[in-house]
Amino acid sequence: MTTTTETETTGPKHELAQVNIARLRFPLDSPQLKDFVDGLDPVNAVADAAEGFVWRLRSDSGNATDVPVFGDDWLIVNMSVWRDADALTGFMYAGQHRELLKRRREWFAHTREAMSALWWVPAGERPTVADAEERLLHLREHCLLYTS
């Protein structure tokens, strides 16, 4: 089942934007985060080549670890756009990304507020960090989170 919206004559009308932010447990240049930092470029290269990948947020550094979010230096942001949910899921739970995902509790603090969001954007539109912050604030205000 495909989860994108499209028409036969014009192709996709919308693409799936995703954001996730994480609160660092240690400074990015610390030995505790070395494996995470060393994994960024290889995982981003896999994402860039993945079926259904459209775009990802990056700064001049090539990733987004230095892009400010919510004015908090301990938060890092990952934001991307995908053809559909199937493409995003296929990347998230496979290969190198899956291996890093398994270790997230070593590197990032547990939080009790929304740290990720998905939403549809018109095809060709690229969300901003302000868009992502707005989505996360909306979820935090209107959604009950169950945490363990």
Features from the language model and the residues they span:
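Conserved small/polar residues in nucleotide/adenosyl-binding loops
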Residues: 146-147
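Glycine-rich loop/turn
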Residues: 51-75
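N-terminal "first-domain core" detector
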Residues: 6-43
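Extended, composition-driven regions rather than compact fold-specific motifs
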Residues: 16, 30, 73, 137-140
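A contiguous, mid-protein "functional segment" used to position or interact
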Residues: 103-143
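Short, well-ordered beta-strand segments in beta-rich or mixed alpha/beta enzyme
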Residues: 18-22, 67-92
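Short amphipathic alpha-helical segments
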Residues: 30-58, 95-104
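An amphipathic, aromatic/His-enriched active-site/gating alpha helix that lines ligand/cofactor pockets
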Residues: 72, 85-114
